[in-house]
Structure formats: C-alpha cells, structure tokens
Amino acid sequence: MATRIRLKRLGMKKAPFYRVVVADSRSPRDGRFIEEIGYYNPTKEPAILQIDEEKAIKWLSSGAQPSDTVKALLNKAGILDKMAEKKAQA
C-alpha cells in the first residue's frame, strides 16, 4: 500500500483549516485516512502549524511520501532536518 502524508481540507468556504494526515495514495483528498499527525491553520496570523514529530518520523521512515505542500511544512517545522540527522547517525 502506497501511503502519502497530505493535507485534508476542513473549515468553511474561504476559511480553510487543514489536518495533516497519512492516507492511502488512492483515497480522495478528504476521504479515508490512516492516521492524523497534525494540523495547519493558514488563516491565523501567523499561521499555526502543529505536527507530532514522532509520528511524522515514524511514517517517513516507513516509506510514506509527503506531498509537495506537506514537504514544505515539514521543512518549516524542522522535522526533515531531524530525519536527515537520524539517517546520518545510522
């Protein structure tokens, strides 16, 4: 099963709120997901980003591919840097 880490859109019209989820790559954007690992609210000033670091690293190390947007968010949160350090130590 190919898994992706991506955003699930919630909220109202013109006021989006996203959950960062791990889902099967074949499931629809707002459909079924395996696990929720965080949330992102771009409407607040500054934008709120909360990601469970342990869960994200677990899924990335097991082969889950982040979408382009989630990759940028993980980079902003510093999780990809910690993942690279972990690989370098191994």
UniProtKB/Swiss-Prot annotation:
Concerning Gene3D superfamilies, the annotation shows:
3.30.1320.10
Report the InterPro entries cross-referenced here.
Ribosomal_bS16 (IPR000307), Ribosomal_bS16_dom_sf (IPR023803)
Question: Keyword set for this entry?
Answer: Ribonucleoprotein, Ribosomal protein
Please state what the protein is called.
Answer: Small ribosomal subunit protein bS16
**Gene name per UniProt:** rpsP
Which cellular component, as a GO term, is one annotated location?
cytoplasm
Indicate yes or no for the key word Transcription: no
Return the similarity comment: Belongs to the bacterial ribosomal protein bS16 family.
- List GO BP terms, alphabetically: translation
Q: List the GO molecular function terms.
A: structural constituent of ribosome
Q: What is the lineage of its organism?
A: Bacteria, Bacillati, Bacillota, Clostridia, Eubacteriales
